[in-house]
A protein has these predicted regions:
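Short N-proximal segments of mature Sec-exported proteins
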Residues: 1-118, 124
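Short, solvent-exposed mixed-charge patches
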Residues: 131-132
Length: 132
């Protein structure tokens, strides 16, 4: 997920589908094994362009979409984590450190903020909550 968020942030990717990650990773691993001279991020970016992008979009997913998915929806949960990592990569931060430093209860805080601003893009809410 970190690699996908990083490549998307750095190379204009906007979609995420957590259900595609395992198959996409397997495909990228095969290509990298056959062509070790190619960079991992380059291969990932190339393969993701041809892959299903999913319903979750960086700038189009609104709080109401997350709320409608329900608080036990794994896809929505992983999209929230991915979007946070995407935003950190876009700002030049270390994604791994940022993900390790997410405070306990952060998801609940995002849910509460989204309930107050259902029409807001989720990315805007995450950025506002970080003081960006």
């Amino acid at each position: 997920m970190e690699l996908d968020a990083y490549v998307s942030a750095r190379h204009g990717g906007t979609g995420f589908n957590p259900r595609d990650l395992d198959a996409l990773l397997a495909r990228v691993e095969r290509i990298c094994a056959a062509h070790p001279e190619r960079g991992l991020a380059e291969v990932w970016r190339e393969q993701k362009k041809t892959w299903h992008r999913g319903p979750w979009k960086t700038t189009m997913t609104r709080c109401r979409d997350i709320l409608a998915a329900g608080d036990h929806n794994e896809d929505a949960f992983f999209f929230g984590i991915w979007l946070y990592a995407y935003d950190q990569a876009r700002d030049g931060s270390n994604i791994g450190e940022a993900l390790r430093d997410i405070p306990a209860g952060a998801a609940e805080l995002v849910w509460k903020e989204c309930a107050h601003t259902p029409d807001a893009p989720l990315l805007d809410v995450l950025r506002r909550m970080q003081g960006k």
